Amino acid sequence: MKTRAGRIATALWLLATSLWAYWGAGEYFFEAYGVRGVPGWAYFVPAAALGLLGALALIRPRWGGILLAVAGLGFTAWWWGRMAARGLFDLQRALGTAPVSLALALVGGLWWLEGRAPGPRSARRFWALAVPAAVVLATALYYLPYVTGRTPAGTGPWRAATAVGVLEWAPAGPGWNLRLGPRYPSWAELAAYGRAPRGFAEKPGPYDPEREGLCAYLDPSGTRLGAEPVGVWRLPTRAELVAALVRGGKLAGCRYRADAPRADCARVPNKEGPLWDPAAPAVYYWTAEATPTGEVWYVPYTGGLRYGGRIAHQPADWGNPRHGYRCVRRLR
């Protein structure tokens, strides 16, 4: 680049693209690696789009800068409009997203200024394109030893003597990540399953998952839902889920400290059988526990340790493929 504006624009673009590359690769390996039907390429779209716009700006700074500015302003308008349509738009949220969205317009303006400088530019500027690719490669090298060779899931129940007691987890069927057509049930739908009219629908709180929840309607075998509550199965607590986390198909030696965002484990847990299905989209399991504000706790397969996720809470009506469940019963 020939001007200070061009050098600043290149540095900012490189930082943004590298961060998106790191986020995309990390989220892909944490959420989507080995999962059936998940388009892994979608995780890399933001970084790829920024990379293409940056490549154009390195070749033709003026035109690339204009496109980046238009993309930044357009994305900002779309994002703010989306928040407004959901009733979530306010000054705090607008300012919180501005560094991500409006920064593109700033970088575009700086590259446009660079484009006004006459004369040839050094070919060394294209080395910047290799940095995001190197970030993806480094992230892959970090994750691949962790995500490959996972123990597959079985279809039957799983019984384990954990630090909090002997637990039995429901087999494949309605007690383990039931799918509702193209979507998955929210915690609120699971917790109010038995409330009239019985079935999956968003029903207002308060919730009593132990009496009205889907798990309470499972028969003793855990394979069928009955017309009346049986009371054999239930959603687990955080302590029970953490104690049952696995690595290499065996218990990972984890314990839970109250309200901590991560577990204390002898080994970093993994998304594998017999507790998890590595080919299914769920990377978190719901618990039966709620906060005083009505949000519900969940536990990631990592136990909140270094490969991603944390023990946290979400609104009860939150439902997506990454938040699953598995019913449990304590044997002793």
Locations of regions flagged by a protein language model:
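An exposed tryptophan-centered "aromatic clamp" motif
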Residues: 212-232, 238-303
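Short, structured beta-strand segments at or near domain termini in extracellular proteins/domains
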Residues: 286, 312-332
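Alpha-helical transmembrane segments of polytopic membrane proteins
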Residues: 36-51, 79, 91-105
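Aromatic-anchored segments of alpha-helical transmembrane domains
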Residues: 16-23, 69-83, 136-143
